[in-house]
Amino acid sequence: MKHIIGKRNALLSVSALGIALLFTAASVNFKSKTGDGVVRCINPEANQPCIMKTFFGLEEPDWSKNSDGNVSSSLVEASLKKGMEWIKDAQGNDGGWGAGTHARQDILDPHSVPSDPATTALVGMALLRNGNTLQKGDYSTQLKNTNEFLMKAVENCPDNQAYITTLTNTQPQVKLGRNIDVILTAQFFTNLLRYDINDAQLKKRIEQSLDKCITKIQKGQDVDGGWKDGGWAPVLQSALANNALETAKDMGRKVDKEVLDRSRKYQNSNFDESSNSAVTGKSAGVMLYSLSSTTRASAQDARKAKDIIEKANSNGTLSEVVITSGNLMKAGVSATEAKELETAYKINEASRKQALKDEVLSGFGSNGGEEYISYLMTGESMMMQGGNDWKKWYDKMENTLLKIQNNDGSWNGHHCITSPVFCTATCLLILSINKDMQFSMQLK
């Protein structure tokens, strides 16, 4: 169980110019440490997002050393508001949202397709990031209905059934993998549990649903460390599965260490250190997918290596901040772990630099939902490491996403995952990515 150090907690919420002033005026620390050792968030007032895990489960970096946090604008805030209103109106009567089938990518009306767990979970995480809880927020009702939809999907699924939905060939499944429903649903439950839930019975249902998802995810791992039935770009599903298990483990849930170890090795194998390039065999030949997955999967260990070296330097154990296996061993890390951390750090640094290139960000050549997912993975990994790379990435994303938002507030894809619900939820997560950072700076 990994604890959060000092004022550092996990990310998840929203961003905009001016929100830092709101947090400056707030004197309440919205975090509490429970008997199980997990750091959770006390439900904040509406529009005061809590520090939580992000969609991809990255730890909060030390932003005070690198940035003022003000990269957003009134244009972004207006865009987020329009997007959130569109998402609210797109919710189905069953509490869910749907992406539709791969065979009917032309259907863009959200009420003309059945709700699916993957899309619903993605929207739920966007609601959480944008300042909503089960108790408070402009879209709290929508979030409660989201949670109920997903809990029922898991509870009604037999233990011996691999998937939590009978729907097949949905856009997320075909492009991101057959297991994507349970993977994103697990991530949603983990994020939700970061808040204190006063209803003991409800909390137990969420925990049981999460544990059931974890079991199904672990059973779906392939022998190479990736995940079975990976869809068009298997590396993306595997990266998301890795994230879901990592964050669940951080929440104190039981996760098989061997499964995680195999998963990280699989992701690292998608970047060739010797040639400093991505291996695209399992990313549909698209470098963006491979790089974003590798960058994300190596981010946690890369950050750990950096923290160990910086701490050893500050206490006098090391005279320089250079991340090598030798220095990690001097800092007290075992030889085996030191080599693993050094490798992860090198891969993360190299893949992040590659991921900022315009030819990589172009992805398939036009934007589909999988491009948006890849952008999000790349950006959050950059945020975790600190520095200015994430600002460069955010500027590119802001310039791109604001231009292509539809007049009704939605976004949609132009190939593969065309669903406006799926794409809008992901774009909301991207544009609101740094609100956690601004709040975390105030807590230092």
Where are the language model's segments positioned?
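Sec-dependent N-terminal signal peptides of Gram-negative exported proteins
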Residues: 14-22
